[in-house]
UniProtKB/Swiss-Prot annotation:
Name of protein: Peptidase T
Organism this protein belongs to: Bacillus pumilus (strain SAFR-032)
Main location: cytoplasm
Enzyme class: hydrolase
Record-linked PROSITE patterns: ARGE_DAPE_CPG2_1, ARGE_DAPE_CPG2_2
Any Gene Ontology CC annotation: cytosol
Subcellular location: Cytoplasm
Binding site for Zn(2+) 2: 142, 177, 381
Active-site residues annotated for this sequence: 81, 176
Pfam families: M20_dimer, Peptidase_M20
Amino acid sequence: MKEEMIQRFTSYVKVDTQSDADKESCPSTEGQLNLARQLVEEMKSIGIQEVTMDENGYVMGTIPSNTDKDVPTIGFLAHIDTATDFTGKNVKPQLHENYQGGDITLNEDLHIVLSPTQFPNLQKYQGHTLITTDGTTLLGADNKAGIAEIMTAMHYLIEHPEIKHGKIRVAFTPDEEIGRGPHKFDVEAFGASYAYTIDGGPLGELQYESFNAAGAKVSIKGNNVHPGTAKDKMVSAAKIGMLFHNKLPSDESPEYTEGYEGFFHLTKFVGEVEEAELQYIIRDFDKDKFNDRKALFEKIASDLKAIYGENSINLKIQDQYYNMREKIEPVKHIVDIAHEAMENRSVTPVIEPIRGGTDGSQLSYKGLPTPNIFTGGENFHGKYEFISVENMVKATEVIVEIARLFEEKA
């Protein structure tokens, strides 16, 4: 299973599948379709049935039930795209067998080193086979590790019919990293009662709580006048943007928050005298606090309009997804089964909130309760991303065990 996992994963990461928030198409990039087509052929070759890919790049397939019991149909999902935070073009995965601790040189020429001094968790992986980048790209374990783990698990179930299970559906989705993964996902066609995204981080992660999330765009109009004659005439849009931002609590940003704490995050600020634009993401686990955060944006905009004019500021806030806990708690047994599956495979479950979102956040509100399970990777979205092959195998074992437990408990 280990060699099969390495071959699959390294094949997937070499395909550039970064999504693009500036594109309106679905998927947003051609590279995602390239990998989707590759997955379709591979799924057929290993015996997955009813394999489909629609015009939007959503790939689905079926492992038929092999039991007489009436077992709920379950699904496993991963996303095809990789993050936009760092380049994902020409990924060159590096294999480090039997890691012995200490620094890992990713790129000698560029002096890029993955060090436990900077990333203390690295020391936990002594004896593991690690896959890293070459220091010039991200790796793409988020979420190609999930794809590899699902594919390997499905292949294992097909090759081992003695493991009884109900009907299983798998899906690989585009554009998760830009928040659109479930937008065109056909829940009815997928036909599962419950599902799991394989999109978490380190070994044991089991998550059924996510942020409530919104995006905000603040567009500001100023008035540019020659600075030599600007007194009482010039209005600097850039300065108004600074005023707007400084009215937000300075300690409620990502670098100062953890656990269940929410935040405001300024992701982009471009400005000059004539016009400026600020883009934010707004996050909180608590629905009331989430609404309070959005209300604060409205108040700041209103206060500044009172000073600079009604047309000086245009604020747009759009909800992106909600805390999936509300939809999963009524069917908490699906979390309990994942918890038991991990313990059965000698994995210690680590239940914690997702300080982010997954496709499951939105799918849960579309009628498909979908908690999230670990992939085994760390340091996603950057050049220091790495993953343990042994922990990828554990994720595959947990997927197989979840399928077995649903049949056993039916």
